[in-house]
Amino acid sequence: MRALSILGSTGSIGLSTLDVVRRHKESFSVVGLAEGHDVHALAEQIKEFRPTIVSVRDENAADELKTLLGPADRPEIVHGIEGAGTVAAAEGSDMVVSAIVGAAGLTPTIKAIKAGKDIALANKETLVVAGQLVSDLVKQNGVELLPVDSEHSAIFQSLLGHRAEDVERIILTASGGPFRNTPLEEMKKAGPEQALKHPQWTMGAKITIDSATMMNKGLEVIEAHWLFNMPADRIGVVVHPQSIVHSMVEYRDGCVIAQLGSPDMRAPIAYALSYPERSESGVKKLNLAEIGTLTFEEPDMVRFPALQLAFDALKAGKTYPAVLNAANEIAVAAFLNKQIGFTDIADTVDKTMQAHEAYTPMELDEYIHADRWARQTASTFISS
């Protein structure tokens, strides 16, 4: 039996993970849960999955959770980013599902790695912000880092059984989001209601906006660089509106191996949890005859400059990826709060990157310093 701690248990990935666990209670147990926003949902999860430790956002949420649980149902309750780290390193778990949204997931994930836990990584920002540090820690601690993002899971599966030297490049697919065919002038007027209508995937608000700007794909390019040791010029992106081909690997003989499946995050989650085996995930079986047509097109870097910004950050290295991510988080939050327009998101990121004097970070604190600087700078651009 594999014992799990789930960071971000009440979010989209967390709920899908628990659905997989629910289907395979003979294979998985839950040791720890961490959430940031929905104490009532966490209380129900505690009653069903009986973790020994949970973390909530702050002391008030901890008090509220205690009132929702009887003494018999009550696990150890901790709070804050330190609490999430305690859950991540909790004794008794052997795998941590890292699904906290944004750079907030970095520190708990590092604590899990240092505690010798295998990582099922849904929090791409961990590698975007501190890819070199995290990669080094994974090697030093002898743990496995298994991708949960559908694209990286597809690449991981498409690489199995092949020699690294035979790989020509990897190709990430992107749905194109809700504005794939929207003229730029109309995109400038788009509000959160339009941007949150993803044509294929059901996800949280932040990642849905990132998909609409194509920043999500840019972050995935940086994540792929660290996961698969692939330089930027050997990572491609192609828009695939049907979201059936999840990504591809091109080999030097001209052959391309791809992984296909219905657009449902439970499939890559089940694969990461069960690896190297496979488990039934509850995902609808793929019927290609019913789908009929699969199409592909080049991404439009003019209408979606966030993707180019991510490639630029990856190529420049140093603290640029951390700054890219932090500025984007601030800009997306401002857009969701209707403080800025849709196209202002990429503009804010661009301005913040241009204002940054990059350096080579060595320690976690140096990555966090760049993250904080970018948040403050992006906030200043937005308020002005």
Swiss-Prot record:
Catalyses which reaction(s): 2-C-methyl-D-erythritol 4-phosphate + NADP(+) = 1-deoxy-D-xylulose 5-phosphate + NADPH + H(+)
One Gene Ontology term from the biological process aspect of the record: isopentenyl diphosphate biosynthetic process, methylerythritol 4-phosphate pathway involved in terpenoid biosynthetic process
Top-rank lineage group of the source organism: Bacteria
UniProt-annotated binding residues for 1-deoxy-D-xylulose 5-phosphate: K124, S150, E151, S175, H198, S211, N216, K217, E220
EC numbers for this chain: 1.1.1.267
Chain sites annotated for binding NADPH: T10, G11, S12, I13, G36, N123, E125, G204
Sorted UniProt keywords: Isoprene biosynthesis, Manganese, Metal-binding, NADP, Oxidoreductase
Binding residues annotated for Mn(2+), in chain numbering: D149, E151, E220
Cofactors, names only: Mg(2+); Mn(2+)
Pathway: Isoprenoid biosynthesis; isopentenyl diphosphate biosynthesis via DXP pathway; isopentenyl diphosphate from 1-deoxy-D-xylulose 5-phosphate: step 1/6
Free-text function comment from the UniProt entry: Catalyzes the NADPH-dependent rearrangement and reduction of 1-deoxy-D-xylulose-5-phosphate (DXP) to 2-C-methyl-D-erythritol 4-phosphate (MEP).
PANTHER family: 1-DEOXY-D-XYLULOSE 5-PHOSPHATE REDUCTOISOMERASE, 1-DEOXY-D-XYLULOSE 5-PHOSPHATE REDUCTOISOMERASE, CHLOROPLASTIC
NCBIfam families on file: Dxr, PRK12464.1
Entry similarity comment: Belongs to the DXR family.
Protein name from the UniProt record: 1-deoxy-D-xylulose 5-phosphate reductoisomerase
Source organism of this protein record: Chlorobium phaeovibrioides (strain DSM 265 / 1930) (Prosthecochloris vibrioformis (strain DSM 265))
